[in-house]
């Protein structure tokens, strides 16, 4: 190997020795409660397919029909020749779902955050962001060139202190996950929105793990907190979690959406989402309304699993964060212990990957369990029994 690649191998070896080397598990089946890996069936407790819509017969059928009608690809970016009727229909549906004037669809959630934040703020502007935000938000903030300040997790006092310097900047943007993907807790959206309005800032909330989950009908954080859309609020979300499809979106005012169509580089330099994915997302939104029992089943399963996990924690002294959602982590501490526990679970028929740095802070490794509406009581009990035996 040349020196360049020798250095890469050295770094890989260092990752391995620290317990930070990553490998891929290959799934040979659909993303259901039970999946096939390496020729054997295991229970899946790590998928974001919260409502089971990725496997819904109507979603699959609609996606196939759209592919047969329009083809596999859109063929270009939206601003060239890749703007299809399905893109506009999906944008109308998500705007209605989120209660906003308009919406814009991106090729992924990551690309949404990477494109939108630099489009809104730059060198003369201020960003204040929660410490535990998703990597895509962090990268979007860094890419923007704005003054980038981080406040301790959900620390409103420190956030207010940072916003006191708002008048030194042209624009200000508060950035937060609404549901934090590694801890499962919920951001204090009402208080954040009040601060945004007081200091004339935008509040951009990433609803990736809230859309389809929070609120009586799954519309997200605003419904959960009984809030109305505000000109200071930017709702970002994805179709790839509870909605079982793929892609990202921004929902907001018409002016905001038109501005992003003209300034967000990841919008006009990316091939647009394919017809089959668009049709699946449209159908998934329809099913969220048509089959409310899915959301009810999800929260019933979450309660069942959490109650069982608390007993595991009490017996085995496992520290459990205060999760408020279907994301339920067990903190395990160090890399090697986490890897061994994940491997032991897999041997016993439970697939839950080890979450390690840089996804979480050093010493904060965890097993991140996620519960789906389609898990059966028997499957949940089996998982809890195995946990009691190995923890």
Provide a role label for each language-model segment.
Residues 61, 65-108:
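Conserved N-terminal alpha-helix of the aminotransferase class I/II PLP-enzyme fold
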Residues 272-291, 297, 301:
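Structural motif of enzymes handling amino- and sulfur-group chemistry
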Residues 57, 61-65, 69, 347-350, ...:
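PLP-dependent enzyme catalytic core of the Aspartate aminotransferase-like
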Residues 149-205:
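Active-site phosphate-binding strand-loop segment of PLP-dependent enzymes
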Residues 10, 16-72, 201:
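N-terminal "arm"/small-domain region of PLP-dependent enzymes with the aminotransferase-like
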Residues 296-303, 310-312, 316-348, 359, ...:
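Conserved PLP-binding catalytic core of the aspartate aminotransferase-like
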């Amino acid at each position: 190997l040349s020196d360049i690649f020798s250095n890469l191998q050295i770094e890989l070896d260092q990752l391995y020795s620290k317990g930070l080397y990553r490998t891929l598990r290959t799934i040979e089946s659909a993303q259901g409660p039970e999946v096939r890996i390496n020729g054997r069936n295991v229970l899946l407790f790590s998928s974001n397919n919260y409502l089971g819509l990725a496997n819904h017969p109507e979603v699959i059928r609609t996606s196939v029909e759209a592919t047969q009608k329009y083809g596999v690809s859109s063929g270009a970016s939206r601003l060239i020749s890749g703007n299809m009727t399905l893109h506009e229909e999906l944008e109308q549906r998500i705007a209605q779902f989120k209660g906003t004037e308009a919406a814009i669809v991106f090729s992924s959630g990551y690309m949404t955050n990477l494109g939108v934040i630099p489009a809104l703020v730059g060198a003369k502007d201020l960003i204040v962001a929660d410490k535990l935000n998703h990597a895509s938000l962090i990268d979007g903030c860094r890419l923007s060139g704005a003054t980038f300040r981080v406040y301790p997790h959900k620390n409103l006092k420190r956030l207010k202190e940072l916003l006191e310097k708002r008048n030194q900047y042209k624009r200000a943007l508060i950035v937060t996950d609404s549901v934090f993907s590694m801890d499962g807790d919920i951001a204090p959206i009402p208080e954040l929105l009040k601060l945004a309005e007081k200091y004339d800032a935008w509040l951009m909330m990433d609803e990736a793990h809230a859309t389809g989950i929070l609120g009586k009908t799954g519309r997200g954080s605003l419904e959960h907190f009984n809030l109305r859309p505000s000109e200071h609020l930017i709702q970002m979300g994805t179709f790839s979690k509870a909605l079982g499809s793929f892609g990202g979106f921004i929902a907001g005012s018409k002016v905001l959406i038109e501005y992003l169509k003209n300034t967000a580089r990841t919008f006009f330099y990316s091939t647009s989402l394919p017809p089959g994915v668009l049709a699946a997302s449209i159908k998934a939104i329809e099913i969220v309304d048509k089959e409310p029992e899915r959301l009810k089943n999800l929260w019933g399963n979450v309660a069942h699993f959490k109650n069982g996990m608390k007993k595991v924690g009490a017996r085995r002294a496992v520290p459990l964060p205060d999760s408020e959602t279907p994301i339920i982590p067990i903190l395990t501490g160090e890399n090697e212990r986490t890897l061994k526990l994940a491997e032991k679970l897999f041997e016993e028929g439970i697939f839950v990957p080890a979450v390690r740095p840089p996804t979480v802070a050093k010493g904060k490794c965890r097993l991140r369990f996620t519960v789906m509406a389609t898990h059966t009581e028997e499957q949940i009990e089996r998982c809890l029994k195995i946990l009691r035996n190995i923890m």
